[in-house]
A protein has these predicted regions:
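Sec-dependent signal peptide recognition
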Residues: 2-8
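Cleavable N-terminal signal peptides
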Residues: 8-9, 19
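N-terminal, motif-rich segments that launch catalysis or mediate targeting to/interaction with membranes
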Residues: 20-132, 139-207
C-alpha cells in the first residue's frame, strides 16, 4: 500500500499542469494519469477496496460529499495555507477546519497500516488521497494564510469577451473549458509523456 500511495502522489504531482482547472475534468484527468502508472497488482487492490470502481470514478467524490453531515468535517481540507514566502508550516493549521496537507497526511498514515483497518476505512481514505493530491496542485487551492481569495476577476477567452468570474472558478472550470475540447483520456494521453526512467526517478523522491 505504501508503494501504491507513492505512485498516486507522484503521478499527480508531476503530471498536473496549469492548463487544467480542477473541476470534474481536472480531477479525473489527474486520476487517469495516476491510474495508468499503477502496477496491475496495485490497481487490482485499489479497485477491490473501491467496490470495483477505478480511482477516476472517485476523483471528484470529496467535492460531492463535503457538505453532507457525515463528511462536513472535511470541508476545510481542500486548500492549504502558505505564508508570504509560499512556505507551509503546521503553525498555519486551523485545528477546527484542518487543511489539505493535514487531510492528506492523516489519510496516508491510516493507509500505511491498511491491513489493520476495515475495508470501509481503507476505501474512504483512498478517496481522500485521490482527491486531495489533485487539489494540492491547483493554484487556487494554495492560499495565503492572511488572504481569503474571495473576489472576482475578469476572464476573457477567444469565444467570449471579458466576464466577471469568481477567481476560484477560473481555475476550477473556465481554463480547461476554453483551452481544449478534449476528453479525460485525451488530456491524459497528452500529459503522460515522461519516459519510464524519469518516472522511476520521480518515484524515488528526494532526501
Amino acid at each position: 500500500m505504501k508503494k501504491l500511495l507513492i505512485l498516486l502522489l507522484c503521478s499527480a504531482l508531476f503530471y498536473s499542469d496549469p492548463v487544467f482547472g480542477w473541476g470534474r475534468e481536472g480531477h479525473e484527468t489527474i486520476a487517469k494519469i495516476a491510474e495508468r502508472n499503477l502496477t496491475k497488482r496495485a490497481k487490482k487492490r485499489i479497485e477491490k477496496y473501491l467496490g470495483g470502481h477505478s480511482i477516476v470514478y472517485y476523483a471528484k467524490w470529496m467535492d460531492e460529499y463535503r457538505k453532507t453531515p457525515e463528511y462536513a468535517f472535511t470541508d476545510g481540507w481542500h486548500t492549504a495555507p502558505v505564508d508570504a514566502r509560499l512556505h507551509y508550516s503546521d503553525e498555519l493549521l486551523n485545528p477546527k477546519r484542518g487543511n489539505a496537507i493535514y487531510g492528506l497526511e492523516s489519510a496516508i498514515r491510516i493507509l500505511e497500516n491498511y491491513r489493520e483497518q476495515s475495508d470501509s476505512t481503507v476505501a474512504v481514505n483512498l478517496k481522500y488521497v485521490i482527491h486531495l493530491v489533485g487539489d494540492m496542485h491547483c493554484p487556487a487551492h494554495i492560499k495565503y494564510a492572511t488572504h481569503d481569495m474571495k473576489y472576482d476577476v475578469l476572464f476573457e477567452d477567444k469565444y467570449r469577451k471579458a466576464h466577471k468570474f469568481y477567481v476560484h472558478s477560473v481555475w476550477d472550470n473556465e481554463i480547461i473549458t476554453v483551452s481544449r475540447i478534449w476528453s479525460v483520456s485525451e488530456w491524459a494521453d497528452e500529459l503522460d509523456r515522461l519516459p519510464k526512467s524519469d518516472k522511476q526517478a520521480i518515484a524515488a523522491g528526494t532526501p
